[in-house]
Amino acid sequence: MEEGSSGGSGSSDSNAGGSGGVQQRELERMAEVLVTGEQLRLRLHEEKVIKDRRHHLKTYPNCFVAKELIDWLIEHKEASDRETAIKLMQKLADRGIIHHVCDEHKEFKDVKLFYRFRKDDGTFALDSEVKAFMRGQRLYEKLMSPETTLLQPREEEGVKYERTFMASEFLDWLVQEGEATTRKEAEQLCHRLMDHGIIQHVSNKHPFVDSNLLYQFRMNFRRRRRLMELLNETSPSSQETHDSPFCLRKQSHDSRKSTSFMSVSPSKEIKIVSAVRRSSMSSCGSSGYFSSSPTLSSSPPVLCNPKSVLKRPVTSEELLTPGAPYARKTFTIVGDAVGWGFVVRGSKPCHIQAVDPSGPAAAAGMKVCQFVVSVNGLNVLNVDYRTVSNLILTGPRTIVMEVMEELDC
């Protein structure tokens, strides 16, 4: 995160040394730990460090063995020694990101005990700060969609800033995307995002107001974190590079000196493979179903893109046309040890490409060809499958999905 540009001292800066500044730094710290923990969780799923394990005739889903994980951290140069690895994992335990499977040990120990990420068993505490953070992360992912052009280089008071959004346009977008039902509600959401340090005015001079003022996200959600950063007690902003899309730096007017504004090179950018299963990568079977989780490795993920199951392209407008031959259905799907068991594909709207016949989605009644209308109450008719998948993967284990099904499909 960035504390703000050098372009003047705003009202937020005046409290930097007081309780407001301390609270802001704590929110930034919490957000960094959440992102770091989530990136580690996904890597461990991908490399099968997290898996179902048995002990005394009982199966513990989605677990890792503390001793094995410490070996892995050292092998992958995420920790220099075992003592450091223990300290790193204790940081995640202290933040409620991991825990002993039976909650019998508060301390992370270098022994053969089972631990689990709380996000993998539905016990992750969603307090107001975490909810605001997850909402902000999801909004950013939607804004990064190729179909969205809201984030643009713009000038304010003679200074050029990258990846900005205009307040009034952002409010329009929030209502249009179903993130808020009214403009007032959208503005209240922006105030919450600002209060939690997720967005800010480009030069940190103004609160959020419905105007032509420019704002940015404070945090680079996509930057690959090193686990060792958890031991760095300084402000996370010192770890952001100038190539971060969230850096609030003044931009040169000389286009020859401008940067590409990418957090990482395209080949190393975080990939999201939208199979909506939390198990490790596997090849695509003849049925078109495959299981995977988002991969954070530098090498491209194995992507399986079977031919669309749809008979013909369908638009969101067509689905919502009065009298259209589509029926609405709502499913409550509780993820099992490896996920939810379906594949989403397409854009505006997304559709169900494949369903694991033995998975939770099939048991709830999900079928191929259905169009995804909403996820946990949020309208997703106008986003692509990557955004839908990220919404599901970063949400609770129990998901409520509304779909529309063609009557003769």
Curated annotation (Swiss-Prot):
N-acetylmethionine PTM sites in chain numbering: 1
Motif (BetaTrCP degron motif): 286-291
InterPro entries: DEP_dom, DEPTOR_DEP_1, DEPTOR_DEP_2, mTOR-Rac_regulators, PDZ, PDZ_sf, WH-like_DNA-bd_sf, WH_DNA-bd_sf
Domain DEP residues, every copy: 36-119, 146-219
Post-translational modification: Phosphorylation weakens interaction with MTOR within mTORC1 and mTORC2. Phosphorylated at Ser-286, Ser-287 and Ser-291 in response to mitogenic stimulation by MTOR: DEPTOR is either directly phosphorylated by MTOR or indirectly via proteins kinases that are activated by MTOR, such as CK1/CSNK1A1. Phosphorylation at Ser-286, Ser-287 and Ser-291 promotes ubiquitination by the SCF(BTRC) complex, followed by degradation. Phosphorylation at Ser-235 by MAPK3/ERK1 promotes deubiquitination by USP7, enhancing its stability.
GO biological process, one term: negative regulation of cell size
UniProt name for this protein: DEP domain-containing mTOR-interacting protein
Organism (species): Mus musculus (Mouse)
